[in-house]
Amino acid sequence: MPTRQNNVLGHTNSRKPYHTKNHVEKTDTLIYALGGLGEVGKNMYCYEHENEICIVDCGVLFPGDELLGVDYVIPDYHHLIRMNKKRKFLVITHGHEDHIGGIPFLLKQVQIDAIYAPRFAKALIQKKLSEHKGLENTKIIEINEDSRVSTRYFTVGFFNTIHSIPDSLGVLITTPNGTIVHTGDFKFDLTPVGTNADYQKMAHIGVLKPDLLMSDSTNSGVEDFSISEK
C-alpha cells in the first residue's frame, strides 16, 4: 500500500529483494533500485557491500492524473532505515528533480554520512534543504570529473556526460567483486553548451572491461537523433 505524507506519496514494496542465489554471502556485493527502473522519475540506486552502502541519486516522481492531490512520489526508504547501522553515502549525478527531489525526505529518516554532488546540483540541493527545518546546514561535498571518493569497500570516480542540465556526471564504482559503470542520464551532443562529454575517458573505461553497465535508457526506443542543447 502506498503511504501518504504531506502530499508526498511513498511507495512501499512488500516483496522481498530479488537475488539470483538462494542466499546472500557476506562477501557479496548487492545491487538494487529503490526507484527509477521501468519508470521516468524516482531514481535511486544502491550498491551495498558488507557494512557500506553507496547510494546514487535520490529523486521524486511527478504523478499522473491517477494520483490527484499528490505533489510527488518518493522512493520507499524502509530498507535503508532497517540498515541504519551501516555506513551510507550519497552520490548525485546531476540536479534534476527526479534525481535530487527526495533528498530532504531521505535525510529525515536515514543517517547519511556524506553527500557528493557536482557544482550546479549542489547549489540546487542547498536551496532545497534550506526550506526544511534542521537540514539547512547539511554539508555537501562538491565533486567534478577529476574527483575520487574512497571508502573501505568502494572507490568512486566520475566522468563528464552531456544532459539537458549543466554539470552532469557518470559514475565508475569499483567494488571488491568488480567494476560498475553507472551512466546517470545522458545523451550524445556534438555541439553542447559548456563542457563536452569525456569521450576519451569513456573509451578508457571500456578498455578496462567493467563488469556491469547500469545505463540510462530514457527515449532509447525513439528513432533519430537527440536535439542539441545549443
Question: What does each model-identified segment do?
Answer:
Residues G10-V91, H96-K230:
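His/Asp/Glu-rich metal-coordinating catalytic cores
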Residues M1-L9:
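N-terminal acidic, proline/glycine-rich, low-complexity intrinsically disordered segments
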